[in-house]
Amino acid sequence: MGSFRHASSGAYNREKYLMARTGMTCECCGETFPRELLEFHHPPNVKKTMSLKVRSWRGIRGPNQKTLDEADQCVILCSNCHRLEHVALKRGESLLHDPSAYRRYRNHRVTRY
């Protein structure tokens, strides 16, 4: 039971950070989502030094400074925009820096299976 409370405090701390930073909004599409659908995206020019899973937000006094510093370097995206951004990056584009690319990827229809 103690580990359940400990784990949920990590989710609570993460949600507090997301609410304070973006109001639970995706920084790409601008839609509001529950915390389970928001993810931290490390831009290509930022060196990823740690994972920002819920467990890294645990702690009796909240997350440590290393976790906060890592989160501050990231972009907060919904799960859909996060996947689209990685597809775009593989193709040499970025949804975050090119609104026309965002529209193109969001409106893309799969024609082959």
Give a label for each model feature:
Residues 1-6, 44:
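BZIP DNA-binding basic region
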Residues 6, 104-113:
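Positively charged, low-complexity intrinsically disordered regions
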Residues 6-10, 58-61:
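Short gly/ser/thr-rich secondary-structure transition/capping motifs
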Residues 13-44, 72-80:
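Short cysteine-rich loop/turn motifs with clustered Cys
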Residues 22, 68, 109-113:
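DEDD superfamily 3′-5′ metal-dependent exonuclease/proofreading module
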